């Protein structure tokens, strides 16, 4: 079964479309200043690509450091491909997450390569880990162990993966005690898998857990996030949570597909929900589509359509929504006590982020129902209403009547004024 088909089948059973937004119950949180990142970025090493990354407010970039690309021949290590990648990222002030993963032909002398490392071959993988971590000590900002082992990227038993993960984290820590280690990289929130991994001791040396809350829409994605937090609470495990992949393709046949027109709304809602739940980092999957518009050879393949932009670095409109969030949310405090409300129905969803590093406050509002609703906003400070699809903005009066629909409104203002939402 192809990856695309398997992805669709699994999501058809596991995902669900939620009609209402779940509001986080964790209280006030501070959004990290380096919250924002993207996957599959930095490979062209071009001025144009890094220019777009800067415009978007990207702090982190992630790529896979394939074992086969580094030690294609047993005992012969070639880091040249990744040296250039890392050096360019550091020169451009981007932090790098290196995913250490997958296999080499020479451990499968009698058969086709699989995404599995048997116990007798683990020492070879650990040697690759040690050499790579030693080579990049002080130059890589985080190491992530494998990718989605509970999905299609691990062909062995859970038990064998837990041992591989445990020993890999141990080897990284021994090689570089200061390394930041991400474990898990789970696809969605596999409760039983996580609990067994914890019981096997595979989380002992890691600094944070990574996961990928893919779902058919942002509401479903946040349900996945809430389940993930419940699982961690059940095992009494406390560590930062990193979202190292989340996104929605604008083409193909994945059930997560969204139109380009609705992508900005999905971007805003997903980022807002994750930030308010206390995620340490969020990396959007991905920076660019595989092909420029009109050049796609297979329009059924959703994997080709996940970008915020195109390979020529022209933007989809979802990129403007990402940039808005990256400009105003870092350093702010998610303030669940705001905005103040009078006679507000529960279908009007609002998230307030106060005192960002730019000295600006942000109010994001949308309606869970399909029809729009008139709501009044009162602020004594001047405010701006931003278009999430274009980056343009317009001024709002001190008291404004707003049409609240399914597409979020993104409002910013300076000062200490507290917003009031009310219906007359």
Can you say where each PLM-predicted feature lies in the sequence?
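Bacterial N-terminal signal peptides
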Residues: 4-15
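N-terminal substrate-binding region of glycoside hydrolase catalytic domains
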Residues: 21-131, 137, 144
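Hydrophobic faces of well-ordered beta-strands that scaffold small-molecule active sites
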Residues: 34-40, 61-63, 96-100, 141-145, ...
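Active-site cleft segment of glycoside hydrolase catalytic domains centered on the general acid/base Glu
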Residues: 73-74, 108-234, 252-269, 298-301, ...
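Aromatic/acidic polysaccharide-binding cleft in carbohydrate-active enzymes
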Residues: 254-327, 337-345
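Carbohydrate-binding surface patches
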Residues: 341-382, 388-391
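C-terminal beta-strand-rich structural cap/linker in extracellular carbohydrate-active enzymes
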Residues: 396-424
